Amino acid sequence: MTPSAKRRTLNTHYFMPPHVRVVELMTSGNTAPEIMSLLVDRMKTVGLKPFVAKRESTGFIQNRVWASIKREMLHVVAEGIVDAQTADDIFVETIVRPGTRPFAAMDYVGLDTVANIERTYAQERHLDTTYTVDYLQREFIDVGKLGIKSNKGGFYPPSTAADAVSTKPRIFVLDNGLSGQIDNLKQGKILEYSFEGEYIRTVFKDQYLPDGIAVSQEENVLFWTCMGSPGQKDGMIYAGKLDGNDIRPLIQQGIVHTPKQIVIDEANKKLYFTDREGLCIWRCDKDGSNLEQVVVTGDNNNECDRRDATRWCVGITFSHTLGKIFWTQKGASKGWQGRIFSANMTIPPGETAAHRKDKVCLLEGLAEPIDLDFHESTKTLYWTDRGEMPFGNTLNRLRFDDRGYALHTDSTPHLKHEIIARKFHEAIGLKIDARNEHVYVADLGGSICRCKLDGSDKVRLVFQEDRAWTGVALA
């Protein structure tokens, strides 16, 4: 190879499966620096994530790390400590799913503690400490860099060390199965994506038009609704573990009509969900028992009522701060008949779900409001609207005062509420991440988006044209 050709030669490593967009770049020993920079820029423009090794290394970066993981995994199985399935499971639960970053985790534990642990392993297994304990002692511990507990930081600067180990939520989203070839209506799926929007796995499949989803952080359980055939009394409510096991029906067919959004009241161990053609809102225990109606908007045995879309309950949320439930009655598709209501979480004495004097219409004439969520600390109601422009396919919010009265605004002309994000494609699912001050929106067009609580910094995390997203939840 000529000297000129050597300067244009380098090592690359692409990853499988194809949705992993990482590529490693490494010099051949003669590669011109400008060639490396050029390739990094070009790869970023086509959606790849390039990583450059600083020097030549057998296995590049990731396979060097992966080799050591494989060695230890083989050791714990070969030594009879655990079986392969259990070793895989604990690795996924403690490293993969939380998105644990090894160096950030070491900073969090403390580098002096890490060194002591490694020293014990080295003594027990007669390991060389040159690149572990000795390296930590010389480069970090001796100069006072112990991780987040020291003002000098560790592998990360002190201001970012704690942030680097903060848990980012996993995204669970429903695909109703209607965006591809439709052979039957039981092609819905529950999928998991990372905080960055990378596909992780399909949790459950073969679902009958799934629509609403919620996560119990206390129990690591998913709850979701399946609409069944629209207009028929064959909707169902399911629960299943986050790991994809123990799926079970909570509400069997023949009880509810078309269940839509579902939310969890962890404080009272209750589930709330709307029933579109059932013309009501239901509440039950987390095991499906003690099912009761809390709001009724019409007679579901009456054909006229059942066909009246202004009576259809779709979105549901609640606020313990205000002691209220909120729900949407969407109206006809793109019909500008949508309304948002509130009522007390407890039915007033002497009243019934069908006759409640505490029921209040907060907003009316909306394009087509769908799912809801409530941000407690700011007393703000958020919702998606899948109606037409100029006010549809939007993310919206309405603030409340301490007494629970709506604070109407004129920030958007002709409206009493705020539109904070636009240009969704049939916006449906909605979930607030209060910890990180984010809002997630899923739409039927195949996009999952995230923005700040004020609607700024909107980014599309996922776009899959062959998906029709409905509900979205976080864990």
Swiss-Prot record:
Source species of the chain: Cochliobolus heterostrophus (strain C4 / ATCC 48331 / race T)
EC number, UniProt record: 1.1.-.-
Amino acids binding NAD(+): 99-104, 245
Pathway: Mycotoxin biosynthesis
Pfam families hit by this protein: 3HCDH
Functional description taken from the UniProt entry: 3-hydroxyacyl-CoA dehydrogenase-like protein; part of the Tox1A locus, one of the 2 loci that mediate the biosynthesis of T-toxin, a family of linear polyketides 37 to 45 carbons in length, of which the major component is 41 carbons, and which leads to high virulence to maize. One of the PKSs (PKS1 or PKS2) could synthesize a precursor, used subsequently by the other PKS as starter unit, to add additional carbons.
Record-level Gene Ontology MF annotations: oxidoreductase activity, acting on the CH-OH group of donors, NAD or NADP as acceptor
UniProt-listed PANTHER family: 3-HYDROXYACYL-COA DEHYDROGENASE, 3-HYDROXYACYL-COA DEHYDROGENASE FAMILY PROTEIN
Entry keyword annotation includes NAD: yes
Domain of life: Eukaryota
UniProt similarity note: Belongs to the 3-hydroxyacyl-CoA dehydrogenase family.
An example Gene Ontology biological process: fatty acid metabolic process
Keyword list, A-Z: NAD, Oxidoreductase
Gene that produces this protein: LAM1
Deletion consequences: Significantly reduces the production of T-toxin and decreases the virulence to maize.
Binding site for CoA: 149
Stored SMART domains: LY
Database matches in InterPro entries: 3HC_DH_C, 6-blade_b-propeller_TolB-like, 6-PGluconate_DH-like_C_sf, 6PGD_dom2, LDLR_classB_rpt
Name of the protein: 3-hydroxyacyl-CoA dehydrogenase-like protein LAM1
Enzyme class: oxidoreductase
